[in-house]
Amino acid sequence: MNYPFPGVPSRPSLALLSALACLSLGTQAQTSPPAPSADGSTEVMLAPVTVQDSLAGETATGPVSGFVARRALSATKTDTPLIETPQSISVVTRDQFEAQGVTTLRETTRYTAGINSSYFDNRVDSFKARGGDVSQYQDGLLRTYGTYNNIKVEPYTLERVEFLRGPSSVLYGQGSVGGVLNLTSKRPQAERLREVQIQLGSHGRKQIASDMTGSMDEEGKWLYRLVAVGRDSNTQVDHVKDDRVVIAPSLTYRPSTDTSLTLQALYQKDKSGSITQFFPWQGTRLPSPYGQIPTRTFISEPGWDKYDSENKSFGYLFSHRLSPQWTLRQNLRRTISEVDYRTLYTSFAANAATGRPARPVFDANGRTVQRDAVWQINGGRMLLVDTQLEGLLQTGEVQHQLLAGMDWQRNTSNQSNWRGPGTALDVYNPVYGTFTPPSASRLVRAPNVAQRQLGFYLQDQLRWGPWTATVGLRHDKAKTETEGRPAAAADDSATTKRLGVTYQAGGGWAPYVSYTESFQPLGGVDFYGTPFKPQRGKQLEAGVKWIPEGKGISGYAAVYGLREQNRKTNDPGNPLNSLQLGEVKTQGFEAELIASLARNWDWTLAYAYTDAKISRSNAGDQGQRVASVSRHMASSWLMHRFAAQGRGGWSLGAGLRYIGPQWSGTSAIDTPSSLLADAMVAYDAGDWRLALHANNIGDKVVITQCLSRGDCFYGERRNFLLTATYRY
């Protein structure tokens, strides 16, 4: 991630304790019953389409036992076996969350092939893959709009995370070339669950959480779920909190087997601050006569610095089977977010009198830095709705799973801000209190930005013997308006396509090839008032999947080539501005294996090679590597449960994560590679479980990113997490 220059919308809020309940996902596979065929008709009703996997009861949104999922929703918006999907996709299950001690969204994907989630930031969740950013969705609807007017996701509220690699606009509309990270919320399920969880960890972490679900009546027509989290914690950076309160209720009404309506709501309040300190190159990546800047150093002002956020969302998931062949679905969500963001950071401003360049540097004494200040009150509003009609047909020997859809969204952001000079600070011996905070009357309201998008899409999954073809077409219209700036308005439209073919060769092997496109309207203007052009991407991918029936194994290997136009990047000559590159060309190879083996072994293995270069540019950087992209990434996690039946007893696990060096955009500096180790030990006594996790057990000082504009960022140091879970 290229960390935006401090001062774009955002804000977390105060949060202390909390605990309650949650419920379990109960989405059932919709298998149409056989229907009589009409005599003499060339178009007959499809008997139950063979999209059902050997693992009975598994659905693309429900709980999975172990690490290996066999079905996914993200690639097709239909409940489809992974082996039939002509695109690489990974699923991280709830069981894997718990085994690896996941506490943030970025930790869910750290053992997933090709996605870089090492960025240590309390403000936002960000990911990179295949040389580009990754779009975030939740329950099939866009999750984020803007930058610092969003919240970080609480992983305890999630059932699973799906990562679809590469351009995916045919189904989702706006999206980047890196792929789509789709989060599946915990949903009500019929099987009763009562769970209470207590965590103690490094930096004074104290968290209590609860998850409850079950049926409210004997017929099972009404199901509920309640998830709650309360946390009081510090961080590895002095004076920065990580407090949170989350309450996420949901209610499902199923009057018949044909109809289901799930109401969802979420309230989240975070109280945090800036752990990204924008340190100079010297003292982090480059040597300093006073040594390395301590990772705990806080550049801002205690008592004033904050990133406080509040988020409220509500919506529904509706499904109704119109006939044995046709099903209507509609998903809707409304989100309201508010962020209060205040911080001081190492100054990027040039000073001709002292000779200071326009990047973070030490003063002449080599110890102090000049600081600038920013205060933002950011707000965001999102309204999203996706309506789908799915049908099952057969023409001759070819089975068709049709999907026609229309989605619409309106997203707005507002901001009031203040910027001003700060005071100097000795980073090796900080003394605070020299900065005088501004009053609220100094805040200046910025123009509101609104974006509307309307999309129509059509998809056909054709099955003929061992062959599966997926064909898709979509048209989008997007309009972005900035209040009081008609010249900055942008009307964008695009038609995107998708074609993929899979051949099931037997033994669980399935080679595939696919072509996909992406379209992402950016909206807004650069520092000089020029509207940003929409980003566009195209990808060709070929690979093979190995998902043998009856075995807990899921693996894939793929090669790909993609091109992206109009990518935004930092302007090294003006840290307040963003540039758009002409074209980026990326090619690479990825491989991943996830296995839940006999004798209670769970294993993940992942590798990715990414070669991303600027292929066309007017900025004089044609042929250079894309900044902040590692050519090589690899990881492996191995866990063994010593109990004979996988229930009760001791478990031991350990993992390694490698991220290769990254080009920073200048030959003056790079981001070094890192190799980190994690470990866990747990005891399961049936109703209760006690687990101890250690991340970065070698306590390595990691630099996750250095940028050409002059700053570097630290990663997370060693931390421990003790979790006690009781189910009753």
Predicted segments — roles?
Residues K271-T284, T412-N414, T502-W546, K551-L579, ...:
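Surface-exposed extracellular loop regions of Gram-negative outer-membrane beta-barrel proteins
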Residues R657-G665, A682-Y728:
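C-terminal beta-signal and adjacent terminal beta-strands/loops
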Residues P466, G561, Q580-T666, T723-R727:
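Gram-negative outer-membrane beta-barrel transporters
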Residues R231-T235, A248-R254, D258-R321, V339-G380, ...:
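Acidic/polar loop-and-plug regions of large Gram-negative outer-membrane beta-barrel proteins
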Residues S319-R321, Q325-R333, S337-Y345, P511, ...:
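Membrane-embedded beta-barrel scaffold of Gram-negative outer-membrane proteins
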Residues Y156-E159, V170-P249, Y253-T259, K312, ...:
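Outer-membrane beta-barrel translocator/receptor signature
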Residues T252-R254, G380, Q399-N411, P447-E564, ...:
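Structural signature of Gram-negative outer-membrane beta-barrels, strongest in the C-terminal barrel
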